[in-house]
Amino acid sequence: MIIGICGFIGSGKDTIADYLVNLHHFRRESFAATLKDAVAQVFGWDRTMLEGRTKQAREWREQVDPWWAERLHMPTLTPRWILQYWGTEVCRAGFHDDIWIASLENKLRHSQDDVVISDCRFPNEIRAIKKAGGRVIRVARGPEPAWYDAAVSVNRGANGNSTWALSQRKLEKFGVHASETAWVGTEF
């Protein structure tokens, strides 16, 4: 069985994944694992910190890396921004929209384990899990963000096409990245 989890930052996706791993012996995987491996190698950042599973790691990912910011002349460069930009604009848009799906499929193709994927962020990831016979759930905690209705409107207006680029342009004023909004309004 494959279970995919969607939700906003801090909604409890990792808590549910931990529950499935610890009590039901699921194998934990993520679409972004390969991305985080590559970014850790290129930038010399701690792989565990890139995961962002602790408060300290989440805070660290939001901090400007002074060496890289100066070296690349990008004063606001943070690990989180690199993960979002490299994962979405560079690899998904610049190479192939399904790159992270294919990477995980390749990793799992001979596995018989029950798997939980706690980082579903795009409609094509949700479709891939469903196509593989899995289920996708949304975790909600607290009120919807201020940009939620705008994201639903933008995403549904694309008639099921990949909408991450459109979402990013339309929602820029809210300061959220497409990886946080692309799944909003998707049928589970």
List the predicted regions and their residue ranges.
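Conserved lysine of the Walker
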Residues: K13
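Short, structured coil segments at secondary-structure junctions
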Residues: H24, K131-G133
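Hydrophobic positions on the alpha1 helix immediately C-terminal to the Walker A/P-loop
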Residues: I16
